[in-house]
Amino acid sequence: MEADAPAGYRDPSGRHGAVTLPARPEPIAFDADTTVLIVVDMQNAYATKGGYLDLAGFDVSATGPVIERIAQAVAAARAAGIRVVWFQNGWDPDYVEAGGPGSPNWHKSNALKTMRRRPEMNQRLLAKGTWDYALVDALTPEPGDIVLPKPRYSGFYNTPLDSMLRARGIRTLVFTGIATNVCVESTLRDGYHREYFGIVLADATHQAGPPALQEGALRNIETFFGWVSDVAAFEAALSSDEARRIPA
C-alpha cells in the first residue's frame, strides 16, 4: 500500500475507490456504487419549532441552513448514483416500542420524559403518523431511496439496515442529519463495529444541546471511529474527473 494512499475500503486487489474526499484526519476514498448517503432523523421533531426537541428545551433555531445543506448533499449523491437512506426515529402511537420502566430508554428519552411532564403531549411526540414524526417538508424521499423507521438512537438497532447494505455491497456510509452527538454518532459507531467506513458531513449535521457537543462529537468521530468532511468537498469530489472514471 502506498504511503500517501487515502484511507477507505480496498478490494482484494488493493484498489481503493475512485472518489477521493478531503476529510479529517486524512482523505478517504470510496466508489459511488458501494456508498450510501444516510439522512438521520430529519423530522419535524428534531428540526422544526414546535417539534419534540424544541418543546424539550433544545435550541433548533439553526437547523434551517443544515436542512439546505442536506438537500445539496442528497442532490449530489443522487446525481452520482449514490443511494439515499432516510431514517425516522420514533414509535407506535401507544409507545410500546419505546419500552416501559424496565427499559433505560423510558428513563433517558427526553421525548418520553417531556410527555410525562406534559400529559397533553402524549401520542403527539415521535409517534408514527404524526406531524412530529414526519420528515421536514424540504426533504423528500424519492423512488429508489430507502426509508427506515428506527426505535432507538442507532440505525442498526432492530432495523434491517445491515442486511440491506450488505446485500448491495455497500462499504462506505456518508452521514448527515440530527443529532450529531446522539443518533448520527450512535449509528456511525455501530457501523464501525460492523466494518463500514463512516464519514460525517459536518455542516449538514446539528447537535442536540450546546455547540460544544457538536465539536466534541466530531472530534470523537475523527479520532476514533470515522472521518469528517463537508458538503462542498463532497460535491466537488463527486463531480471530479476521477470520480467519473469507470474502474478497469
UniProtKB/Swiss-Prot annotation:
EC number(s) stated in the UniProt entry for this protein: 3.5.1.110
GO molecular function, one term: hydrolase activity, acting on carbon-nitrogen (but not peptide) bonds, in linear amides
GO BP term (any one): uracil catabolic process
Catalytic activity field: (Z)-3-ureidoacrylate + H2O + H(+) = (Z)-3-aminoacrylate + NH4(+) + CO2; (Z)-3-ureidoacrylate + H2O = (Z)-3-aminoacrylate + carbamate + H(+); (Z)-2-methylureidoacrylate + H2O + H(+) = (Z)-2-methylaminoacrylate + NH4(+) + CO2
Active site: D41 (proton acceptor), K150, C183 (nucleophile)
Protein's UniProt keywords contain Hydrolase: yes
InterPro entries attached to this UniProt entry: Isochorismatase-like_dom, Isochorismatase-like_hydrls, Isochorismatase-like_sf, RutB
Keyword Mitochondrion: no
Keywords assigned by UniProt, alphabetized: Hydrolase
SUPFAM superfamilies xref list: Isochorismatase-like hydrolases
Pfam families: Isochorismatase (PF00857)
NCBIfam families: RutB (TIGR03614)
PANTHER family, A to Z: ISOCHORISMATASE-LIKE DOMAIN-CONTAINING PROTEIN, PEROXYUREIDOACRYLATE/UREIDOACRYLATE AMIDOHYDROLASE-RELATED
UniProt-listed HAMAP family: RutB
Family: Belongs to the isochorismatase family. RutB subfamily.
Its biological purpose: Hydrolyzes ureidoacrylate to form aminoacrylate and carbamate. The carbamate hydrolyzes spontaneously, thereby releasing one of the nitrogen atoms of the pyrimidine ring as ammonia and one of its carbon atoms as CO2.
Protein name, UniProt field: Ureidoacrylate amidohydrolase RutB
